[in-house]
């Protein structure tokens, strides 16, 4: 039902991560299609800028924008589903902490290092990993 309030107790929530080159750089929670909606939203902001209008950007959407324009595939992967919102938030926090403790440079605001990494630092971390065969990106970070 469009516009209906989300039931935070219903097991309809999931945890996802955005990846480039199979390198996770952002972890979030979603309800229905939020993760794939985020990619469409970034594309809409790019179109706004191309039309001379201002885009709205934050840390992870700047990273997504860079790789969309590169172009290099940005994928989202569901890492846990069928959760209530409170459990999804716990899984999200644990995943962010695990990625950070393993040395990942990520684009999350919550549970990330301070000062936050710049988009360029996140991009540089991703780009130091080998590209899957067949990808080409000439744009520099």
Place the predicted regions along the sequence by residue:
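Conserved short loop/helix modules at catalytic or binding sites
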Residues: 31-89
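Positively charged, low-complexity intrinsically disordered regions
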Residues: 18, 35, 39, 49, ...
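GIY-YIG nuclease catalytic motif and its immediate N-terminal context
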Residues: 1-37, 86, 90, 118-141
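BZIP DNA-binding basic region
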Residues: 23-24, 103-121
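Surface-exposed polar/charged interaction patches
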Residues: 69-70, 102, 128-132
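Intrinsically disordered, low-complexity segments enriched in small/polar residues
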Residues: 1, 28, 50-53, 80, ...
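Alpha-helix boundary/capping residues
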Residues: 42-45, 95, 129
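Short arginine-rich
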Residues: 94-106
């Amino acid at each position: 039902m469009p516009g209906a309030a989300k039931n935070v107790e219903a097991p309809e929530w999931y945890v996802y991560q955005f990846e480039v080159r199979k390198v996770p750089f952002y972890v979030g929670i979603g309800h229905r299609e939020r993760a794939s909606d985020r990619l469409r939203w970034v594309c809409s902001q790019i179109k706004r800028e191309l039309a001379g209008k201002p885009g709205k950007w934050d840390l992870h959407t700047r990273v997504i924008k860079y790789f969309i324009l590169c172009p290099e595939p940005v994928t989202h992967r569901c890492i846990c589903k069928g959760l209530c919102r409170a459990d999804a938030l716990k899984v999200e926090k644990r995943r962010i902490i695990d990625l950070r403790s393993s040395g990942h440079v990520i684009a999350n605001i919550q549970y990330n290092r301070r000062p936050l990494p710049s988009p360029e630092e996140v991009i540089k971390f991703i780009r130091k990993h080998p590209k899957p065969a067949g990808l080409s990106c000439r744009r520099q970070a």
